[in-house]
Amino acid sequence: WLLGMNLDSRRNIVSYEIGAAKIQSRAYFDKKDELPMYESFPGWEGLSAALQAKGYDSAPRFVFSGTLYSRSGTAPMVFNAVDPGREARLLRYPAFLEAGRFPEAGKPELALGALAAEKLKVGIPLRPTKAELEELAAAAPTGEDAAFVLSLYGPPPAKAKGAKTSVFENKDPARAAAEAAKLALKEGATKAELDRLWAILAASGRMDVRIATTIDLKAAPESIRGAKFEGELLPALGPEARARALAAYEKDPLTGDYRLAAPGTAEAGAVQDDMAASGFSGAIRHVNQLVDAVVVGVVNSPNPKTNGNVGFIPLDALQDESGLMLAGRVTELLVRKAGADDSALPGKDESPEAIAAAVAAELPEGLAVRGWRDYVADFLAAYNGDNVSTRLMVFFLFLLSFIGIANTMLMAILERTKETGMLRALGMTDGEVLLAYVLEAGLIGAIGSAFGVAAGCLMNIPMVAQGIDYSAVSKEMGGDFGYRITTLFKSAWNPLAIALTGVGATLLSAAAAVPPSLRALRMPVTDSLRFE
């Protein structure tokens, strides 16, 4: 089961979230959890062309955080500014839209994760209350549109008799009653009807949102107080960076402050990079920015990372002063082999080393290629923790089995002490008697393990085919609990583990016969024959 969750999560990370690798600046990677916009890089087009010539797809991104405002609320978000065409070629989530469409290049359009859309009441509501539906109808442009909106909703369909319910479903009566009182979008709604409903809701202003963010820009201060320059900046710099700073700034003999001698030059740019790398607070300029956008789609893919508080907006819509003033810069370039199989994990030709070698001539200093595993610490922590727990459980199960088998063999050999003495009196060596008991115990273990493995395989068949519905757990945890799975946790076949289990159980049973057999063989033959 854990193997199935692990494999599905790895595939979903590669196919829906990251690709095989990312090209980023080393400085950005060191602070990636902070999403440092100022550590972006230009010239990604040349890298992309070089990758394409070597048989790789690539997709640029500019990742930033902010707050999204809708008519009904606000939510903290992570935004991915993407190239829609390249993104769709490399990753698969743009095809998994719950409603609407993916944003088009050059337009201030936004696709939201399903959970964010639900929180902000954006998109097509699937389970509105009666009051919410009446509000939607009242906001429709015409009476005909209002009637159309009302016609698409009705009471939720009753569960079929005997229908399966998730074992993890919340059984709170109050919550169940509230859910039962909600209406539901009719199951037979066609794409044309949903598109018309989306257009009506968009015309009412439901899809209008505003992004509030802070643009972080590297900027060498034109003036720095002397105490701060000498006491904070210079000690944080290396010898070469310190020399550049002293050459770029001149000390005012009257005030003692340091002033930038030549703003806008290459030397000033090098100094501002040194300041940012050292963490000097004055090297980053913060600019508050508002960006108006329209939500055109809701993403609901098999990877929960694309379905949470995340938004996707065209990269070219944020280039100028009305956006983020990107000037062609990106924070990362996703990479995947062209035509790669979604069911397969990246191979050697998609390793960071292979990708770096393919673009070595075009890869600027300061940029590095890193594999997808470097970006999924949450998943690896969850998997490793569960793996340790599983190993401990297996260890204790084997320990209990060993104790049970050893106790059974002890009683069996103890009851046959006279038989053991008779065999030894008839000429069998101690080794032959020991071998007989070990083979007997091993055969018993083999029969038991065969039944156990067969029962386990039979139980695993529905686990592989259907899995366990964890959608209720996923929803309660906001869709993000480490593993990149949204609803069904499926098992997988592991022939090696199955074979090792059978062989291990057989050997364990045989080993359990050794201690009581040796105890019986240490008894003199005469005492064995008189044993009662």
Regions found by a protein language model. Give the residues of each.
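Hydrophobic alpha-helical transmembrane segments of multi-pass inner-membrane transport and secretion
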Residues: 1-5, 384-419, 442-455, 503-511
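Hydrophobic, regular-secondary-structure patches
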Residues: 1-78, 88, 94-106, 186-187, ...
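Short helix-loop junctions at transmembrane helix boundaries
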Residues: 5, 451-500
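Solvent-exposed, non-transmembrane alpha-helical starts
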Residues: 32-42, 69-71, 76, 88-92, ...
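Short, solvent-exposed hinge/capping segments at secondary-structure junctions
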Residues: 91-92, 112-127
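Mechanotransmission and gating elements of multispan inner-membrane complexes involved in transport
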Residues: 159-390
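C-terminal membrane-exit region of the final transmembrane helix in multipass inner-membrane proteins
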Residues: 488-532
